[in-house]
């Protein structure tokens, strides 16, 4: 085939597309741009087939979205080359030349070459192919063959079968996206509540003969005019978002990625406020639109199902005067029931809880609730009957989380609790929350509910035991609903939330003790986590101070339960068994303190040594051998380690008090997710740096570090480290660490050059780059000792602890203890340190600057001594 110069056609097409985009920038009307881009490509293709002819009798058809008449700036151009018979060699060459020309033209064709029989066979086996062919549109070639395809597709279309297949396909797609529209980086095309859901409804409606557009579907009685208007608005919003994503990235990109969210917000003219990022405001708009689509999708799919598979209403069984069971769905008896008696807007959810045979609500009921939600106003909220109903929903033995989720989706909970409305769809770009505030809140309620279920007792033994003994544990659900309700307002969200829940408690008639409990829980919902993860629990004063703040055992149990549920509802990556152990340790120590066991340091020391001695005797150690080793240890060591750790150290070190080689011993932790590492060697300035460098290179995440120097100058350091995710054989890992770390300590200088920090997963690195945490460092003297407390906050990154350890070594600062608190991609660490450099203002300032540089990822500044 002779060479065809496509440059003139390509240049005309590119100029026309650029003009269309420029027009869109002046007047951002999505449909106008999509139609114009489609028209430009239609015209280019018709010119192209004159230059590169189709095989004789063949048809060129647009399919899929392009066939529907929409073309996004960087979408594939979906084409069908329809042949009247299987291709000859000449036909194959003609098709090959045409496809090559499509690429040369700068289009990205998604093409298929089929006969009519091929199309029918493929459509029978794949609902996606059938849907694409149903939207086929003639571009060039044989119109007769195109009509035969249209006739064949319509003839084989079975509305009922098509509906069921599309519903299954939609359910599978939703499952791939975790069944939530609230993803951190949603796909505006494929995620639940996105463009694809809108297209599915129209495909179903079209197949059933209810129309091709929202107006026609409304005329068929499946939609009200206001619903059609809402869906049309949402569709336009998502179309524009998808267009902006393509234009912003210069590629086919349908995901609202972290990196793109600030740029998108700027395109939309959304500015940051004093309390919220522009990207958070953008995403809240997205989630509100996706929630609307999700809800109307449920109503419409049920409506179409009821039309396609009609069953007589005689199947219905009355539940009471207002509701009936219609095919295992809750159905309102009177269409105007909610308008006549708005109290039913809450009672509907209570009835759902009380009737486990119900699998959902009928489309009629969902629609009636949706359209009556405006009846929940100030007068409704003041009504004692409604207040009692709301508390009853929280007090039911089943269905609490399901109904709270349904109430949120139908906009009933945000209407009843206006303060809750502010947090619906509110994303927190803080590097550790992976849910919107409302979804996190409901996840906390779900976790609290799980504590009450026997099937989860093995997973949460202490929590299950405590909640079973907690009087009126439904108060925890109230605290959960309000614990983050003031997020995004500025100020202390715990304090603001406490005021909101106090008002709720007064309005809903909670007795004074219960009102005081929920207010305490909301005000102090972060307290237990902070103390457990940032303070030294071996210090009796820390426990006494915490016990004084908590006050009594009921508060302690409730705070423990809320804390565990809260952390576990933040992100799958934030919770680990080590945090669980710290919280449980703090709970038990505080319980003892509240019970009158106000032990001073001397009593704690005596009891701990007695228990450790008992454990060493059980291991066969003689008292004199043990005491020879213990004589090298001071009081601080015994106060900082529990009896089990002391006994473990003693068993391995009593016979080698001054060894020539480093001693490294490792064992799996009690909770089975990490390793406990003991390092015993002659003390050296770079010891902590070397050890941290090894852990970092092996992707072992340090959770806790305790550094001790014996009376005769040996370092006895203890670490809790977590193994990489998915590492199952902890005993094999323990053996490997014992060998490798001992080797590293024998020759630390050679190892320094071999250190290669671990890498964060790509998505985490992107998120932390776009939404970094401002590095903070606060150095303050410890009021009860000669040491200092260094608190740091920063974005997590490979080698961070190693970088800090190097700063300690370079400034002559000794580490006594480290408490590492990792919250997703954010770290909040506390170090107890000492050193003469901290006593002089100038060198202290240089140390703090170097710490900030390390937190920010910069090379330490060279300071004059």
From Swiss-Prot:
Reported cofactor(s): Mg(2+)
Region annotation (Uridylyltransferase) ranges: 1-318
Protein name listed in UniProt: Bifunctional uridylyltransferase/uridylyl-removing enzyme
Region (Uridylyl-removing), start-end ranges: 319-675
Annotated ranges, domain ACT: 676-762, 789-865
Disordered: annotated segments: 747-767
Gene Ontology BP term (one): regulation of nitrogen utilization
Entry similarity comment: Belongs to the GlnD family.
Top-rank lineage group of the source organism: Bacteria
Entry EC number(s): 2.7.7.59, 3.1.4.-
């Amino acid at each position: 085939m002779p060479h065809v110069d496509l440059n003139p056609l390509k240049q005309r097409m590119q100029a026309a597309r650029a003009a269309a985009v420029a027009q869109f920038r002046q007047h951002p009307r999505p449909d106008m741009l999509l139609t114009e881009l489609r028209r430009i490509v239609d015209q280019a293709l018709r010119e192209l087939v004159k230059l590169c002819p189709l095989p004789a009798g063949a048809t060129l058809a647009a399919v899929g979205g392009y066939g529907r008449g929409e073309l996004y700036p960087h979408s594939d151009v979906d084409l069908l080359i329809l042949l009247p018979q299987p291709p000859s060699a000449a036909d194959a060459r003609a098709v090959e030349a045409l496809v090559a020309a499509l690429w040369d033209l700068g289009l990205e064709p998604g093409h298929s070459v089929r006969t009519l029989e091929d199309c029918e066979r493929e459509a029978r086996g794949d609902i996606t192919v059938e849907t694409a062919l149903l939207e086929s549109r003639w571009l060039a070639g044989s119109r007769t063959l195109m009509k035969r395809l249209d006739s064949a597709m319509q003839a084989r279309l079975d509305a009922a079968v098509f509906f069921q297949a599309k519903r299954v396909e939609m359910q599978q797609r939703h499952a791939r996206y975790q069944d939530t529209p609230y993803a951190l980086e949603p796909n505006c095309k494929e995620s639940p509540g996105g463009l694809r859901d809108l297209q599915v409804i129209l495909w179903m409606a079209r197949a059933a003969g209810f129309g091709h557009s929202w107006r026609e579907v409304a005329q068929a009685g499946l939609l009200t005019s206001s619903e059609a208007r809402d869906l049309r608005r949402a569709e336009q919003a998502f179309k524009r978002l998808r267009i902006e994503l393509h234009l912003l990235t210069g590629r086919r990109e349908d995901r609202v990625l972290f990196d793109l969210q600030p740029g998108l917000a700027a395109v939309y003219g959304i500015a940051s406020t004093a309390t919220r990022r522009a990207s958070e405001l953008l995403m809240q708009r997205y989630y509100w639109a996706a929630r609307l689509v999700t809800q109307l999708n449920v109503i419409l799919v049920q409506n179409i199902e009821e039309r396609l598979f009609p069953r007589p209403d005689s199947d219905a069984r009355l539940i009471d005067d207002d509701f009936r069971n219609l095919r295992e769905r809750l159905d309102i008896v009177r269409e105007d029931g909610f308008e006549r008696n708005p109290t039913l807007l809450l009672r509907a959810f209570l009835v759902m809880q009380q009737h486990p045979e119900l699998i959902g609500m009928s489309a009629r009921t969902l629609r009636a609730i949706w359209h009556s939600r405006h009846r929940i106003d100030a007068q409704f909220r003041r009504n004692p009957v409604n207040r009692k109903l709301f508390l009853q929903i929280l007090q039911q033995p089943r269905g609490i989380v399901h109904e709270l989720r349904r109430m949120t989706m139908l906009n009933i909970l945000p209407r009843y609790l206006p303060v809750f409305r502010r947090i619906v769809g509110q994303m927190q770009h803080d590097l550790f929350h992976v849910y919107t505030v409302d979804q996190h809140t409901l996840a906390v309620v779900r976790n609290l509910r799980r504590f009450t279920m026997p099937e989860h007792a093995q997973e949460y033994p202490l929590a299950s035991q405590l909640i079973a003994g907690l009087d009126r544990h439904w108060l925890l659900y109230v605290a959960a609903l309000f614990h983050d309700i003031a997020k995004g307002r500025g100020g202390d969200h715990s304090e603001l939330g406490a005021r909101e829940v106090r008002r709720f408690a007064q309005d809903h008639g909670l007795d004074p003790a219960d009102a005081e409990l929920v207010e305490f829980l909301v005000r102090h919902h972060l307290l237990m986590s902070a103390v457990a993860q940032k303070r030294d629990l071996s210090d009796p004063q820390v426990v006494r101070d915490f016990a004084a703040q908590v006050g009594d055992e009921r508060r302690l149990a409730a705070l423990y339960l809320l804390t565990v549920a809260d952390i576990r509802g933040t992100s799958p990556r934030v919770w680990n068994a080590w945090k669980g152990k710290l919280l449980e340790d703090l709970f038990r120590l505080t319980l003892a303190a509240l019970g009158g066991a106000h032990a001073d340091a001397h009593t704690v020391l005596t009891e701990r040594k007695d228990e450790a001695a008992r454990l060493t005797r059980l291991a066969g150690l003689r008292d004199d051998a043990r005491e020879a080793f213990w004589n090298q240890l001071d009081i601080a060591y015994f106060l900082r380690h529990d009896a089990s750790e002391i006994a473990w150290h003693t068993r391995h070190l009593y016979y080698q008090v001054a060894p020539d080689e480093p001693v490294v011993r490792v064992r799996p932790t009690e909770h089975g997710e990490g390793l406990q590492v003991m390092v015993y060697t002659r003390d050296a300035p770079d010891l902590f740096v070397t050890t941290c460098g090894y852990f970092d290179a092996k992707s072992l995440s340090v959770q806790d570090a305790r550094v001790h120097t014996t009376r005769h100058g040996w370092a006895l350091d203890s670490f809790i480290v977590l193994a990489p995710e998915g590492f199952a054989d902890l005993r094999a890992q323990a053996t490997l660490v014992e060998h490798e770390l001992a080797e590293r300590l024998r020759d630390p200088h050679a190892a320094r050059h071999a250190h290669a920090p671990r890498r964060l997963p790509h998505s985490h690195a992107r998120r932390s780059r776009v939404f970094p945490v401002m590095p903070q460092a606060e150095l303050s003297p410890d009021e009860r000792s000669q040491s200092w407390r260094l608190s740091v906050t920063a974005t997590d990154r490979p080698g961070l602890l190693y970088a800090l350890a190097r700063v300690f070594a370079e400034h002559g600062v000794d580490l006594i203890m480290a408490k590492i608190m990792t919250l997703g991609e954010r770290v909040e660490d506390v170090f107890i340190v000492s050193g003469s450099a901290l006593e002089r203002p100038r060198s202290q300032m240089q140390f703090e600057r170097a710490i900030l540089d390390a937190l920010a990822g910069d090379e330490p500044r060279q300071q004059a001594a």
